[in-house]
């Protein structure tokens, strides 16, 4: 509370420095918050496109696999899937967006040529190949969606954290500091007025004493 602060010139200078530092910090955090929101909106737009693409790829993959099962049978489809020898590889790196570390997910060996799928060209139909193509496309969409969704969550968390810090400065710390400054200013002004009043009394008393001394000296001179 303001009343807990000792009203001295030193404390006034310290609290003014804290106000200046806090206001500059508040401005910096506001700029960061606004920048994060803009970046988040860009990622949100991208996320909507990615989700739409993912849903479309999922529906296509389901249609292709259902068609392959209907035409070739579950045994043939399962056998083609089990023949896969080289699995996709996922690598995760990071990227910094305004101080927020977000993942960059790269997938390799997802899309394969016919001879890399393990089941061979002969003995399978175009339906199975189309289903494989569709699921490879779906897997790449899933990887991209995971990257974008994770980035969006991290950005949103940082935005909320920054907003809380801005609000703490704006609605708690800065008002308390300004209240403390006003309290010290008021007390110092009171002390200054009291000191001026005291000095005036001393001056008046001194002048009265000098005047009395002058009158006494004059009376003594007249009596002589």
Swiss-Prot record:
Q: Where is this region: Disordered?
A: 200-224
Spell out the subcellular localization from the entry: Cell membrane
Topology in the membrane? Peripheral membrane protein
Q: Which InterPro entries match?
A: V_ATPase_D (IPR002699)
Please list the residue ranges that the record marks as compositionally biased, kind Basic and acidic residues.
200-209
Do you know which Gene3D superfamilies this protein is assigned to?
1.10.287.3240
* Main localisation: membrane
User: Cellular component GO terms, alphabetically?
Assistant: plasma membrane; proton-transporting V-type ATPase complex
One Gene Ontology MF term: proton-transporting ATPase activity, rotational mechanism
Keywords attached to this entry: ATP synthesis, Cell membrane, Hydrogen ion transport, Ion transport, Membrane, Transport
- Signal sequence span per UniProt? none
Q: List the disulfide bonds.
A: none
Compositionally biased tracts (Low complexity)? 215-224
Which GO terms fall under biological process for this protein?
A: proton motive force-driven plasma membrane ATP synthesis
What is this protein's function? Answer: Component of the A-type ATP synthase that produces ATP from ADP in the presence of a proton gradient across the membrane.
Q: What family, per the record?
A: Belongs to the V-ATPase D subunit family.
Q: How does it assemble?
A: Has multiple subunits with at least A(3), B(3), C, D, E, F, H, I and proteolipid K(x).
- Can you say what this protein is called? A-type ATP synthase subunit D
Gene encoding the protein: atpD
């Amino acid at each position: 509370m303001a009343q807990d602060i000792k009203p001295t010139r030193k404390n006034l200078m310290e609290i003014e420095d804290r106000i200046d530092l806090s206001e500059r910090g508040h401005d910096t955090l506001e700029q960061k918050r606004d920048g994060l929101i803009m970046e988040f909106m860009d990622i949100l737009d991208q996320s909507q496109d990615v989700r739409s693409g993912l849903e479309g790829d999922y529906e296509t993959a389901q249609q292709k696999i259902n068609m392959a099962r209907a035409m070739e049978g579950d045994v043939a489809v399962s056998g083609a899937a089990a023949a896969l020898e080289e699995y996709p590889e996922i690598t995760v790196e990071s990227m910094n967006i305004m101080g927020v570390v977000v993942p960059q997910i790269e997938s390799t060996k997802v899309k394969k040529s016919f001879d890399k799928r393990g089941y061979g060209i002969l003995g399978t139909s175009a339906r199975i190949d189309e289903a494989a193509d569709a699921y490879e496309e779906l897997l790449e969409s899933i990887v991209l969606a995971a990257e974008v969704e994770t980035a969006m969550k991290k950005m949103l968390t940082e935005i909320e954290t920054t907003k809380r810090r801005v609000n703490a400065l704006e609605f708690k710390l800065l008002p308390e500091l300004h209240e403390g400054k006003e309290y010290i200013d008021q007390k110092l002004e009171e002390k200054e007025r009291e000191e001026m009043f005291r000095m005036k009394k001393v001056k008046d008393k001194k002048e009265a004493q000098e005047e009395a001394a002058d009158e006494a000296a004059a009376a003594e001179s007249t009596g002589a």
